């Protein structure tokens, strides 16, 4: 992937130092103050999520879809553990592309996922991709043998270069997920979703300690979906063959 110089971004007196990156979203390596003030260790909570930078930062996430903040020196009490694990036989719900908060009356505006400083590295990836590109990619990558009568018109539409109407995308994705869950074993399903990641242009970079990923979750123009992604086949198909660092999560527009 070719590295490109990103356009400058300013949040009040603070200027994010952006990584050279041409993939999905923006990657912030550090913050710099135009007046030369030192940057707080936890620049996410002490600068970006505080007024007057808070709303411009949330708007930046809405616009970019994904903003990655590197080298954040501390966590915050509002973070909570990301729970859920997968098994040898079936995928857990977290391995399917999803928005957060779908079961509630209103989805959160932004989802933050944090890899805290810890003794054990995080080996399992998190894939983040635009919606409804995830739905179109799932249709394209669906094996022909799994195209049911319900999915056939949507599959044909996708292969012909058409787009599923946004109002129908949740329905179609639900049909796809049920088909995958019913007809593919766990490792075949993981291989399928790896292909979906690539087609949808997912962000799947390795986690680093002190990294936060801010994901637009409710923006009608630039919303994202995410999933837990096993990028390597584990011995005997088992995903838990090595120690794996944990992740934290919160909904910063509502909780921070």
Question: Language-model features: where?
Answer:
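Active-site environment of non-heme Fe oxygenases that use a 2-His-1-carboxylate facial triad
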Residues: 4-19, 26, 30-37, 41-43, ...
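Surface-exposed ligand/attachment interfaces on beta-rich extracellular proteins
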Residues: 51-54
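Short, flexible, solvent-exposed loop/turn segments with mixed acidic/basic and small polar residues
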Residues: 56-60, 102
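Short, well-ordered loop/turn sites that connect or cap secondary structure elements
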Residues: 61-62, 207
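Short, solvent-exposed coil/turn segments at beta-strand boundaries
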Residues: 62-64, 169
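Short, hydrophobic/proline-enriched secondary-structure or compact coil segments at domain edges
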Residues: 65-71
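An acidic- and aromatic-residue-enriched active-site/binding cleft used to recognize and process polar
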Residues: 72-73, 218
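Contiguous, amphipathic alpha-helical segments that mediate oligomerization or scaffolding
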Residues: 74-78
């Amino acid at each position: 992937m070719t590295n490109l110089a990103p356009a400058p971004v300013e949040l009040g007196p603070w200027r994010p130092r952006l990584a050279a990156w041409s993939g999905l979203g923006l990657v912030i390596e550090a913050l710099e103050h135009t007046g030369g003030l030192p940057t707080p260790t936890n620049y996410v909570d002490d600068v970006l999520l505080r007024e007057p930078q808070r709303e411009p930062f949330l708007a930046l996430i809405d616009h970019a879809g994904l903003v990655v903040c590197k080298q954040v020196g501390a966590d915050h009490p509002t973070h909570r553990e990301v729970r859920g694990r997968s098994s040898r036989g079936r995928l857990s719900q977290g391995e399917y592309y999803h928005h957060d908060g779908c079961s509630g009356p209103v989805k959160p505006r932004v989802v933050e996922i944090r890899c805290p400083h810890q003794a054990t590295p995080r080996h399992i990836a998190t894939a983040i991709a635009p919606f409804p590109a995830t739905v179109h990619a799932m249709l394209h990558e669906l094996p022909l043998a799994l195209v049911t009568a319900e999915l056939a018109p949507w599959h044909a539409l996708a292969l012909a270069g058409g787009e599923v109407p946004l109002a129908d995308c949740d329905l179609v994705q639900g049909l796809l997920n049920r088909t995958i869950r019913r007809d593919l074993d766990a490792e075949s399903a993981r291989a399928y979703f790896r292909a979906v990641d690539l087609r949808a242009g997912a962000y799947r970079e390795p986690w680093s300690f002190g990294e936060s990923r801010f994901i637009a979750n409710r923006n009608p123009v630039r919303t994202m979906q995410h999933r837990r992604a096993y990028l390597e086949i584990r011995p005997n198909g088992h995903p838990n063959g090595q120690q794996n660092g944990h992740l934290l999560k919160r909904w910063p527009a509502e909780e921070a």
